[in-house]
Amino acid sequence: MKLEDAKIKYIHTWGSLATSWGINKTMAQVHALLLVSTVALSADEIMETLKISRGNVNMNVRALIDWGIVRKEFVAGERKEFFVADKDIWELFKQVTKERKKREIEPVLKVLDELQKDVNENEEGVEEFKKLMSDLSSVTNTVNGILDRAIKADEHWLLSNFTKMIKK
């Protein structure tokens, strides 16, 4: 398979897989394209390669910048904006983990805490509900702690501990 064909296959596969993780297909394809590109790309180049609209490119590039996994890069002599993705996959993993934790885990913990405090004490089934919320909070806090360690860890520490955990 030629390199260009392999890149296209990767971009389309990554886009399809991403929907399983709750990530927009086009956003994943834009990120994959920037990841496999050896040079910074303009919105026009992204549009042309992926056959998507300028608005779609701009919306997804901005979202990727907000996630901290794509950045603008200055190209001398050009007025257009160019974009590049960080090629360090370990740093990518840590950044995505950090953002997902902030966007998904932390709001859940806040709601679980509120639900335990704000429920009317005088109703039947309150204790069972509070225990359920407490148990969910405990599990979510454990996951949150694991994610914190993963974000702070180096690649070898995490992979080593993950391998030990699987072997048990």
Regions from the language model: what does each represent?
Residues 18-26, 42, 75-96:
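Short, cationic-aromatic polyanion-contact patches
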Residues 68:
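Glycine-centered, phosphate/nucleic-acid-interacting loop/turn motifs that mediate DNA/RNA or nucleotide
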Residues 89-135:
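Amphipathic alpha-helical dimerization/coiled-coil segments
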Residues 117-168:
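C-terminal regulatory/oligomerization modules of transcriptional regulators
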Residues 8-20:
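Short, Lys/Arg-enriched N-terminal segment that forms or immediately precedes the first helix
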Residues 45-48, 64:
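A short acidic, leucine-rich amphipathic alpha-helix
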